């Protein structure tokens, strides 16, 4: 259990455990994949560990490996479902002192002025909020890809 006071990450994990959080994409072994609150790049997701921990270095052994594998697998799903040319990953925890990974699809057709910018340089205020109407189909496809990749992974084990 985390020693940090409840953060937005704690609240998102609590909401993910219920059936009323529309942003939930999938439950993975290490935690929850959710759509970013602001879709600054369509398909932007977060991986939230469950249980919440303070930072990556608190995890050891299998739990650390599983989180990082789930992060990469989520990136595979986002890349496949968005047609992204690459995925940007970010793990900070400075503003919200609890482990969480940001997964951003980067596309070849992004405006030249921002194509090489890190995601925090983008206009988050102008980014559309996540909604099932606008992003639900993409969320569903990412979730299906993650479910299929889990099935293939368990067959290899």
Question: Predicted segments — roles?
Answer:
Residues 1-157:
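HIT superfamily nucleotide-processing domains
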């Amino acid at each position: 259990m985390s020693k940090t006071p409840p953060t937005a990450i704690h609240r998102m994990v609590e909401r993910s455990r219920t059936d009323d959080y529309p942003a939930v994409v999938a439950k993975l072994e290490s935690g929850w994949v959710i759509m970013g609150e602001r879709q600054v790049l369509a398909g932007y997701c977060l991986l939230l560990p469950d249980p919440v921990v303070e930072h990556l270095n608190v995890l050891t052994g299998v739990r650390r490996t599983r989180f990082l594998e789930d992060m990469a697998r989520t990136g595979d799903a986002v890349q496949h479902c968005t047609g992204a040319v690459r995925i940007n990953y970010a793990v900070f925890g400075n503003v919200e002192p609890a482990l969480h990974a940001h997964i951003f699809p980067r596309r070849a057709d992004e405006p030249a002025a921002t194509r090489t910018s890190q995601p925090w340089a983008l206009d988050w205020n102008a980014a559309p909020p996540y909604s099932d109407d606008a992003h639900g189909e993409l969320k569903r496809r990412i979730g299906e890809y993650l479910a299929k990749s889990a099935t293939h992974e368990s067959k290899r084990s």
